Amino acid sequence: MRPLMMPLLVGALGLAVPVVPAPAHAYVALMAGQSARPLQGRFNNVPVLHSNQPEEVQGEGILVSTTPGYAYAAETGQPLANATYTFNGEFGLHVHHKYHPQDRSRISLPGGRRGELTLATILINPGPNPVHLRFSEGAVRNSFEAPYLATNLMGVKPLGPRPWNTGPGDATAVQMLRQQLDRRLADEITIPPYSRLVLFSTALPAKGIANALLKGRSDGPFQMAVVAAEDPTSDLDILAVLDSGRLAPGRIYLSRVNQIQSGAVFSRVAGVALGDRYEARVDHDLDQSPLHVPLTSTNRHDFGTGEIQVNPLAARMLDSSLDNVGTYGVRFKVELLLKGSGPYALVLSHPAPNGRHFIAFRGSIGIK
């Protein structure tokens, strides 16, 4: 028996992990003539605020808020109910946005500078008692701190510091896989009664990308909001965006709400998902057959297993996806108890049905 533990932090659809006899010359097509096996794992119930809709933010405004009430869409003036939720205890945060300014002049300002958008997460204490938060792991990166290097996207990541090479999403995921907290983030913070604090902010030049993943625990109830501010000079300017009651422009799925409800389109996540961890255990004899297990399977792509590995939302904005499609910010911990005479190859693949083209999985896995 060869135990193999594979923690992954993933955000891609339709990943599959086959364990197959090592080929003498070349790999055959993934799963050719073979079937996949469901993992039959489970998500935990840790609430995670996801701010990913709109992915491409066009200007200043609120992105998502869990306070009671509503905010007005920049495109239509329509009031949209907030993703109302109060956190208390263990929690998580996932933020992923691009800045594509509606005002195209901000792409290139005088002096060769680009206009900047500040993404910020705000903590809100609605009650009469102070709330203390402790953070155990996480990071915030933008694409200028962690750029994509197209010629060096994959590779082994040593345990020590290294230049990130696969973008801000991978940079933050690696920090989570290592269970480390970015030294630039506070490991604890107290929100006074009836108060609001800016937890962190990152300035994002036009056409840039930012990603944040964070895990923590509170000793009392609190709420969160994520906002975008153009050229703020202080935290007061950031809080003023929340007080404006105006959503950031770029919500392209507002006109497709019926298609979201019917399942015709996924949209992106703006709300609170239940689950930051998925655990499964598989026993298999490789002398009997290869093993194929899907990761992040959906109702559209389950590889014949009938298993949907997507966690639900406890609260969502109207134009959000119906669940945490893509399982962003979820750590998949899969324990493979394998036996066989070997040698065998462990392959992480991103199969595309019917030869269609998709963005390849470029995330990180940890193997123990």
Name each region found by the language model:
Residues 192-321, 325:
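Acidic, serine/threonine- and glycine-rich low-complexity intrinsically disordered segments
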Residues 88, 184-197, 207, 288, ...:
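Solvent-exposed, conformationally flexible loop/turn segments
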Residues 30-92, 96-98:
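N-terminal, Lys/Arg-enriched amphipathic/low-complexity engagement segments
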Residues 140-156, 223-225, 354-367:
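Short aromatic-acidic-glycine turn motif
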Residues 14-23:
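C-terminal segment of classical bacterial N-terminal signal peptides
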Residues 150-205, 368:
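Intrinsically disordered, low-complexity Pro/Gly/Ser/Thr-rich segments with frequent PxxP/GP/PP motifs
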